[in-house]
Curated annotation (Swiss-Prot):
Organism of provenance: Homo sapiens
Signal peptide segment: 1-27
Taxonomic classification: Eukaryota, Metazoa, Chordata, Craniata, Vertebrata
List of residues binding Ca(2+): 1589, 1591-1592, 1594, 1597
Domain Collagen-like: 399-447, 487-545, 546-590, 805-862, 863-899, 1099-1156, 1157-1172, 1441-1499
Record protein name field: Collagen alpha-2(XI) chain
Residues modified by glycosylation: 1604
Domain remark from Swiss-Prot or TrEMBL: The C-terminal propeptide, also known as COLFI domain, have crucial roles in tissue growth and repair by controlling both the intracellular assembly of procollagen molecules and the extracellular assembly of collagen fibrils. It binds a calcium ion which is essential for its function.
Gene Ontology biological process: cartilage development; collagen fibril organization; roof of mouth development; sensory perception of sound; skeletal system development; soft palate development
Family: Belongs to the fibrillar collagen family.
């Protein structure tokens, strides 16, 4: 066996299994190769290969972006050893001070670490927090940051740690840890970095291992002889002649790699070990005691550079290749070669001050070496007085521990911690039902499957340890670090295997609303709903803008003392003081190895007088902070004067999210889940604060004596033995060289001032020692000269808060702070004193509408004025109904600042906000405790205030808040645009009688009739119409007050009147609209009712309040002048039906209205109930000529006949010819009241007949049903404003009345333009009614006299000539329902007149019963395809709305289960022509309806010609749906049935086409976008093959896929199996385009694909590597989205199935596959790809 292999196969001498004392459970445990555990051979990001310490070695170069970590449990599944060795071969960048390896606990506490540089630090902290940071070992005087290779070993045993560097220098430091130290292995181990530390390791590393026990650290030095190839060295003469001569028990144990493979060639290879006993090169004989660690009090520091002399003179014949240890200049900038190392002489000569030492430690004394025990003689005499001990730098003399300090204050509660770590996976669920059988795959051609050659792996290791929830715990540990050390996002972690199919779940909640459908036809206007309930009180509005700075306030009282300031910067080490005088003589003590602290020296010379700072209040010192890392030495900056506080900067944007709080408590462990894959290494966690030391556990009981073990190997020389017998005092030795600076001792008491010595030469500055205890306060010194401005130091670690100090003086008024969070409502404060009235401010914008004020008392009646040009305004009418709340006005300008109110009660503590970035420096705080005196710097100039800091970065989104309470309804939206005019609605049922209309305008006076005979005095006639307006008469006496009138119709809102005087302050207004939802706050307690506030300034005029109770009738005012025409108001909402009014006087006929537009025929309504008998109607117009019948004699009126049964429909008769108009018949006798008939079926519309001649004007008939609502008229000109009325006397304020119930709105009629109002005549006294005089002779016409009194109504005169068409009259209000008139004799049926123009739209009637479904209107052109929007957030649950009216029929739903046969229904009307079926039999003509009232003559509107759409792929030509003989030209008769059938057929076909577009069926002509869309539209579809078209263009590129509805609607595409590189085809074998796959990815959220390959006898094949569609390499080792679904190769049978399930949709489908063991011979089998399935 060759003496040396490559140096990267470092032969680590491992402890023997026999007789080694290691930590429990670690006997024979293997070493841990940290580089391999961190996957260095696979070269992760930031790592590349480099040359090692020997040219042929392999090392790894680590750059800054590398992030290398792994769960600690993965490396140490059995726990971390108590005693261990840490071995490494490393080369760092010159000048670097960075960690090499750090181990963190689950709580993020740094437990173990090794930091390289100058100096070398070893970090250790066990579970009890020991040792404290100041006691952690630091190896000063060593520098490993020189850019050269170093072999470093660290041995930790007991209470000490030993560092061995290059086998030349060995330093031991105490490690005061607990007796049973335990390190937590549930955390993470990180290479080359620390959490929240900028310094990272940069350099090369060849070996890094952790070995249980300490022997490996010492044995590693024996391998110095096993250097690079060709560098074999001679052995010293005192060593054994040759390795081959050793006994088998003397062979050293070595750590090997297979020599025929490189570390990176086989990723799955494991280290294996052969154990050889160690050999020792010691000149002593006999047995060697076991290794003993030094006691905590002793310090062992052996610098063996003198013991291992340079070797140039001893090795002149050894030739080393020039590249053996050459440092690469291009890497770190240093060149040259190191001198070769030769064999060392491990023996030393004996002298006065020397003992025999080996390379590995001190040798044994003669007594110990031979006998194993020291024989003690009699006690010697008392020795002479010892010399004073000289504490040289480098020595550490530990004094006794000080008394326990007082307990610190309870710290403030920490911010809310992050969520705890994810618990272990739960128990496996019960197996689900068996899935549906998959469809049979297409049989592939034999032997043409894709064959990818496999190769067997040459070796296989055992399965790794179980890692249950390491990744989740590591993430929880490292959450704090992800903000500070945010690297590129790592790959997603492994997911567990999918469980079996579960039981079907309960029905899910209602899904979200689908996409908005096309706009339907506009429905009829619904009734106005009742007024809604008053909304809840809105939330407080957003905080106002920042106000202007107020005037400076009065200086306040002194505030409480602030918290102690941050610790000051550490001062420089002072110069060495003069040598103290010898102390008083002490008693002679026994000579010890290391003496106790010597007698205290004389006090040193007093230092220069320092400046005395202002004395601050004594604060209680906080506990010591965590020791920070030693930064690079910088120049000491001088302390500048305190600057004045600068003006506050602009408000910055919210800073980034602060660091999370401390880790929450670990939850209880869940039950152990199935074994998961090893998790990816987590990010490093942050430095946690040191934990409090735990209580020392009770000592355990002494164990039983164990059996004697076998003879162990020859041990190493132990540490220093116990004190021997006092020897003879030796001669005083030569003065030794100055040692390194030691730790400063405790400050002694102030001694007597000595004489001033001469100024010595300033010495060189030593290294910074640890910070000593605080010195006493020195006397006040004179101020020094101003110094230079120093650099700004780094921000120190904030100390713990101290006690609050005393109250300081009140500071000046600061600038307004940022608005705070809204606190809870405080209790009502006391009423403040009334302030002086301020000056009148500018008129603010109109505020929100307030509630109705209390009704004021009636004002005093004004005096009657004379007839002026304009009378005073009339009495105020009753208030109208409450209108809707107006939109809130714009925010007014900020008023002047009010007086300070009484302080409210403190609100509840708010939730802790996110920590922002460090803001700009604040104003100076209270003077903290006196810091350590620094060097007196020169005084700097006074600085200017700094500019405001830049705005912080945008904060990260916070965690989700608590679910807020239900918000108030938002403000009403803006009115939408007018939709297209809808079809005419169905006629409603007859409305209830409305209120009586007002009197009509006076008609034209008719011609005087011939005088009739004098009649007897009849009953008093009805009041006649008003005559012409006479001249104004004299004012009559005051009439009696009239009875209270009916409530009038709400008047229109008049113009805004002149500004009135200041009114009494109104009550609080209604809440405004809901503001934007704020942060959810907790419900506060209800506050108390406050006292009334001060009188406010005059408010703007409020809107009309709700109607109050009717007031007393006031006196009749003087007639006012006629006002100008008002502006017609907007149409009011539909009011409730009013109570039946008294019968009004008969009005005059209004002029006929304009001709309306033609309406579509509506379905016949149900027959209404028979009304009461009405008055006889006027003679009707001449009817159409009927068929000639035989003239019969008029018989006497017969008794009323009974109601006959409904006869069967007659056959369709031929249309008769139009006859000439018949003679007007006499009005028939009133017939009996008939019973209510059943609803008749709709008859076919008759052909229009010619218009008949205009008949004579008849008497007024009964009031007809309200006509359709007319279009709103043009707005009239605005009326002139009336003159301002005189101010009434100010009435006393009335008591607040009970708020009245809101009155029901009255019926709203359309307001027409009001006619000119005549002056009101005086009220005449009622005269007695005289008898009618006799007939007088006709006299000559006299002159036109004054208008006489209104005479009685005369008899109806003959019909006058038809006047010209008048202007369009106003629609009258709904009259009472008239009694039914007598049934007239049936007239002959006339020809059907032409359809009249549609009339004006009448008032909306009451909701009618459900009518027949109307015809579907023509569909509009399809809009452009919109992009699929993102799914919106679910809105807040709205209050349940009233039930809406029946909408138009929806699309046909899925076929339901067949119901039981129903009862035979009545025959329905003939349906429209179907889309594709043959024409049905012609329906029977319905019974001829009674002739309607002839409409006014109008123009015949020709129907528009129907333009058929051009035939496209997705439309159907309507004319093709009819038989050829039924098709008619477009210019045919518009009223013929064939044209309507064609239209209806086209509508049906269009409806089907639209239905297929809205609800695709998955066929080739109606493809869906994805299978998810098919599932949403047709949830009843089974699994199978369907057509999809993801890009929704032309359907020619649609392709067929397999839809797995059972799995939620997956769209699966099958790969081809006849090519060497995978491509994907549809179910018919056609390739799927790249564009279609891209669209399919855009419509999906995840995808998965299975890959399987057969096993062929090997225990495990090499890893399968897959290439995704985006060229990513996918394998279980590199991607968290690839996992083994079934491992058949583990049992050497079946197949192994990998599942790729990824949210990165660009990775699928898989395009190629290969194996990593391609060097092996091929074997049977290939890779079988399953379909790729996309889930939308």
């Amino acid at each position: 066996m060759e003496r040396c292999s490559r140096c990267h196969r470092l032969l680590l001498l491992l402890p023997l299994v026999l007789g080694l004392s290691a930590a429990p459970g670690w006997a024979g445990a293997p070493p841990v190769d940290v580089l391999r555990a961190l996957r260095f051979p696979s070269l992760p990001d930031g790592v590349r290969r480099a040359k090692g310490i020997c040219p042929a070695d392999v090392a790894y170069r680590v750059a800054r972006p590398a992030q290398l970590s792994a769960p600690t449990r993965q490396l140490f599944p059995g726990g971390f050893p108590k005693d261990f060795s840490l071995l490494t071969v490393v080369r760092t960048r010159p000048g670097l001070q960075a960690p090499l390896l750090t181990l963190y606990s689950a709580q993020g506490v740094r437990q173990l670490g090794l930091e390289l540089g100058r100096p070398v630090r070893f970090l250790y902290e066990d579970q009890t927090g020991r040792p404290q940071p100041p006691s952690q070992p630091v190896f000063r005087g060593l520098s490993l940051a020189d850019g050269k290779w170093h072999r470093v070993a660290v041995a930790v045993k007991g209470q000490s740690v030993t560092l061995i560097v290059d086998c030349k220098k060995r330093v031991t430091r105490p490690l005061p840890r607990s007796a049973r130290p335990v390190l937590d292995t549930h955390g993470v181990i990180i290479f080359g970095a620390r959490i929240l530390d900028e310094e990272v390791f940069e350099g090369d590393v060849q070996e890094l291992a952790i070995v249980p026990g300490v022997q490996a650290a010492y044995e590693s030095c024996e391998q110095k002889e096993l250097e690079c190839e060709g560098g074999q060295r001679e052995r010293p003469q005192n060593q054994q002649p040759h390795r081959a001569q050793r006994s088998p028990q003397q062979q050293p144990s070595r750590l090997h790699r297979p020599q025929n493979q490189e570390p990176q060639s086989q990723p799955t290879e494991s280290l294996y070990y052969d154990y050889e006993p160690p050999y020792y090169d010691v000149m002593t004989t006999g047995t060697t005691p076991d290794y003993q660690d030094p006691t905590p009090g002793e310090e062992e520091e052996i610098l063996e550079s003198s013991l291992l002399p340079p070797l140039e003179e001893e090795q002149t014949d050894l030739q080393v290749p020039p590249t053996a240890d050459r440092f690469q200049a291009e890497e770190y900038g240093e060149g040259g070669t190191d001198p070769p190392e030769g064999p060392y002489d491990y023996t030393y000569g004996y002298g006065d001050d020397y003992r025999e030492e080996t390379e590995l430690g001190p040798a044994l004394s003669a007594e110990t070496a031979h006998s194993g025990a020291a024989a003690h003689g009699p006690r010697g005499l008392k020795g002479e007085k010892g010399e004073p001990a000289v504490l040289e730098p480098g020595m550490l003399v530990e004094g006794p521990p000080g008394p326990e300090g007082p307990a610190g204050l309870i710290g403030p509660p920490g911010i809310q911690g992050n969520p705890g770590p994810v618990g272990d996976p739960g128990e496996r669920g019960p197996p689900g039902r068996a899935g549906l059988p998959g469809s049979d795959g297409a049989p592939g051609p034999p032997g043409t499957s894709l064959m990818l050659p496999f190769r067997f792996g040459s070796g296989g290791g055992d399965k790794g340890p179980v890692v249950a929830a390491q990744e989740a715990q590591a993430q929880a540990i490292l959450q704090q670090a992800r903000l500070a050390l945010r690297g590129p996002p790592g790959p997603m972690g492994y997911t567990g295997r999918p469980g079996p199919l579960g039981q079907p779940g309960s029905p899910g909640l209602k899904g979200e609303s689908g996409d908005l459908g096309p706009q339907g036809p506009r429905g009829p206007q619904g009734l106005t709903g009742p007024p809604g309930k008053a909304g809840r009180r809105g939330r407080a509005g957003a905080d106002g803008a920042r106000g202007m700075p107020g005037d400076p306030g009065v200086k306040g009282d002194r505030g409480f003392d602030g918290l102690p300031g941050l610790p000051g910067e550490k001062g420089h080490r002072g110069d060495t003081g003069a040598q103290g005088l010898p102390g008083p003589p002490g008693e002679d003590g026994e000579r010890g190895d290391d003496g106790e602290i010597g007698p205290r020296g004389l006090p040193g010379e007093s230092g220069p007088r320092g400046l005395l700072g202002p004395k601050g209040p004594p604060g209680i010192p906080g506990p010591p902070g965590v020791r920070g890392m030693d930064g690079p030495q910088g120049p000491k900056g001088s302390l500048g004067p305190q600057g004045e506080p600068g003006p506050p900067g602009q408000q910055g944007t919210p800073g980034t999210q602060g660091l999370p709080g401390p880790q929450g408590a670990i939850g209880p462990h869940g039950e152990k889940g199935p074994q998961g894959k090893p998790g990816l290494p987590g990010m490093p966690g942050s430095d946690g604060p040191p934990g409090h030391p735990g209580k020392e556990g009770p000592p355990g009981t002494k164990g039983n004596q164990g059996p004697s073990g076998p003879q162990g190997p020859l041990g190493y020389p132990g540490p220093r033995g116990v004190k021997g017998v006092d020897g003879i005092r030796g001669l005083k030795g030569h003065k030794g060289e100055k040692g390194e600076d030691g730790f400063p001792g405790f400050k002694g008491d102030i001694g007597v001032k000595g004489d001033r010595g001469e100024v010595g030469v300033p010495g060189s500055r030593g290294e910074d020692g640890p910070e000593g205890p605080k010195g006493r306060t020195g006397p006040t010194g004179d101020p020094g000269p101003p110094g230079l401005m120093g650099e700004k130091g780094k921000l120190g670690v904030p100390g713990l808060p101290g006690y609050p100090g005393r109250q300081g003086p009140k500071g000046s008024l600061g600038f307004p702070g940022f608005p705070g969070a809204s606190g809870e409502k405080g209790a009502r404060g006391l009423s403040g004193k009334s302030g002086p009235r301020g000056e009148r401010g500018p008129t603010g914008p109109r505020g929100q509408r307030g509630p109705r004020g209390a009704t004021g008392k009636s004002g005093a009646k004004g005096t009657s004025g004379g007839d002026g040009p304009h009378g005073p305004p009339g009495e105020r009418g009753l208030p109208g109904p409450q209108g809707p709340n107006g939109f809130p006005g714009p925010k007014g300008p900020l008023g002047p600042p009010g007086k300070d109110g009484l302080p409210g009660h403190p609100g509840q503590r708010g939730e802790v906000g996110f920590q922002g970035k460090t803001g700009p420096p604040g104003p100076p705080g209270v003077v903290g405790p006196q810091g350590a005196a620094g060097e007196t710097g020169p005084m700097g100039e006074r600085g200017h205030p700094g500019p405001p800091g830049p705005p912080g970065e945008q904060g990260l989104p916070g965690t989700a808040g608590k679910e807020g309470t239900k918000g108030d309804p938002g403000p009403p939206g803006a009115p939408g645009k007018d939709g297209p005019a809808g079809l005419r609605g169905f006629p409603g049922e007859r409305g209830l009688p409305g209120t009586a209309g007002g009197p009509g305008l006076k008609g034209n006076e008719g011609p005087s009739g011939p005088p009739g005979p004098a009649g007897s005095p009849g009953e008093r006639g009805a009041a006649g119409s008003g005559g012409p307006i006479g001249p104004p008469g004299r004012p009559g006496p005051q009439g009696p007050p009239g009875a209270a009138g009916e409530k009038g119709v709400p008047g229109e809102k008049g113009p805004i009147g002149p500004t009135g005087r200041d009114g009494v302050q109104g009550p609080v207004g209604l809440p405004g609209p809901a503001g934007p939802p704020g942060v959810a706050g907790e419900d506060g307690d209800k506050g108390e009712v406050g006292d009334p506030g001060q009188k406010g300034t005059k408010g703007n005029k409020g809107e009309h309040g709700p109607p109050g109770p009717p007031g007393p009738i006031g006196p009749v005012g003087q007639p006012g002048a006629a006002g100008a025409d008002g502006e017609p108001g907007a149409r009011g909402p539909q009011g409730h039906f009013g109570a039946k009014g008294d019968e009004g006087t008969r009005g005059f006929n209004g002029p006929p209205g304009p001709i309306g537009l033609q309406g579509l025929p509506g379905p016949s309504g149900e027959k209404g109930e028979t009304g009461d008998v009405g008055p006889m109607g006027p003679p009707g117009p001449p009817g159409p000529r009927g068929p000639a019948g035989p003239n019969g004699a008029d018989g006497p009126q017969g008794p009323p006949g009974g109601v006959g049964n409904l006869g069967p429909p007659g056959e369709k008769g031929e249309p008769g010819e139009s006859g000439s108009p018949g003679i007007q018949g006499e009005p028939g006798v009133k017939g009996p009241r008939g019973e209510r008939g059943e609803k008749g079926e709709s008859g076919q519309p008759g052909e229009p007949g010619p218009p008949g001649p205009k008949g004579p004007t008849g008497d007024d008939g009964p009031k007809g049903n309200p006509g359709p609502v007319g279009f709103p008229g043009d707005p009239g000109p605005p009326g002139e404003g009336g003159p301002r009325g005189q101010d009434g006397a100010k009435g006393d304020r009335g008591e607040d009345g009970e708020p009245g119930q809101p009155g029901s709105p009255g019926p709203t009629g359309e307001n027409g333009p009001p006619g000119p109002l005549g002056k009101r005549g005086p009220a005449g006294s009622p005269g007695s009614e005289g008898r009618q005089g006799g007939k007088g002779a006709k006299g000559d016409p006299g002159a036109i006299g004054a208008p006489g009194k209104t005479g009685p109504v005369g008899p109806a005169g003959p019909a006058g000539k038809p006047g010209p068409d008048g202007l369009r009259g106003l629609p009258g209000s709904v009259g009472q329902q008239g009694r039914p008139g007598a049934t007239g004799q049936a007239g002959p049926p006339g020809p059907v007149g032409p359809p009249g123009l549609p009339g004006l739209r009448g008032d909306a009637g009451a909701k009618g019963e459900k009518g027949h479904p109307g015809l579907i209107g023509l569909i509009g052109p399809p809009g452009e395809q919109g992009e699929k929007g993102d799914r919106g957030l679910p809105g807040p649950q709205g209050s349940p709305g009233q039930k809406g009216e029946m909408g138009i029929p929806g699309a046909s739903g899925p076929i339901g289960p067949g119901g039981p046969p129903g009862l035979p229904g009545p025959a329905g009307p003939k349906g429209a022509k179907g889309a594709t079926g043959p024409g049905g039999p012609k329906g029977e003509k319905g019974v001829q309806g009674p002739p309607g009232h002839p409409g006014p003559p109008g123009e015949v509107i020709q129907p528009l010609p129907i333009q058929m759409p051009k035939k496209t792929r997705r439309s159907v030509d309507g004319s093709r749906l009819m038989q050829e003989d039924e098709a008619i030209p477009t210019g045919g008769a518009p009223g013929s049935p064939g044209g309507l059938e064609e239209i209806f057929g086209s509508l049906d076909s269009l409806r089907e086409e639209i239905e297929q577009m809205r609800r695709p069926t998955g066929t080739q002509d109606s493809p869906a976008r994805t299978c998810q869309d098919l599932k949403l539209c047709h949830p009843e579809l089974p699994d199978g093959e369907y057509w999809v078209d993801p890009n929704q263009g032309c359907a020619r590129d649609a392709f067929r896929v397999f839809c797995n509805f059972t799995a939620g609607g997956e769209t699966c595409v099958t790969p081809r199996d006849d090519v060497t590189q995978f491509s994907y085809v549809d179910s018919e074998g056609s390739p799927v385009g790249v564009v279609q796959l891209t669209f399919l990815r855009l419509l999906s959220v995840s995808a998965h694909q299975d890959v399987s390959y057969p096993c062929s006898g090997a225990a495990r094949d090499g890893p399968l590597r897959l290439r995704g569609a985006n060229e990513d390499e996918l394998s279980p080792e590199t991607s968290p989205y690839v996992k083994e679904f079934r491992d058949g190769c583990q049992t050497q049978q079946g197949r192994t199935v990998l599942e790729v399930r990824t949210p990165v949709l660009e990775q699928l489908p898989v395009l190629d596959a290969s194996f990593s063991d391609l060097g092996a011979p091929p074997r049977r089998g290939g890779v079988l790809l399953g379909p790729v399935c996309f889930m939308g």
